[in-house]
Amino acid sequence: MGANNASATGAGYIATYDPSSGTVTKLTAKGFDSPRGLSPLGMDVVPSTRNPDELTIYVINSRPPLVDLDTSLPPGIREAKRDEVASARAKEEGPDPSIEVFRYLLGGDSIQHVATWTDEKIVISPNDVVGLPDGKGAWFTNPLPYRVGIVRPHFSNYH
């Protein structure tokens, strides 16, 4: 999701690539039911300390702002209205980033969602993450100290 499209619902995904066969496998994200979807910006893949066949995947999710709407609206209209409201909020507030944590078993075709980490005062504009092998912590960078403002689009062009 670009700096000018902080309201788009993320249709991104995580995939594996097997260089010996040239096969790309789009992984199903089990247990990840965010209405804002996944908009991966950066990620780290770390071998598990408890199982040699398991990986922990940390993903920066540059998701749009959360919008609660009247559930009595018909589904098609509700989604259109949600995107319209999210677009307006994104221009004022910027994206609502998170760090998503998944587990992956080698050779599998899915990842299991473990956690969503977010804090509007700390997870401000992350663009890189380095996860811990135990799946319980990570380091991440915030190259910009704010989510919106007149200077942000200019900084975003250089990051």
Tell what function each PLM region has:
Residues A6-T9, K91-E93, H154-N157:
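A generic structural micro-feature
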Residues K26-G135, T141-G149, P153:
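Asp-box/WD-like beta-propeller blade repeats and closely related beta-sheet repeat scaffolds
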Residues G2-A15, S98-E100, H159:
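A short loop-to-beta-strand structural motif that recurs across blades of beta-propeller domains
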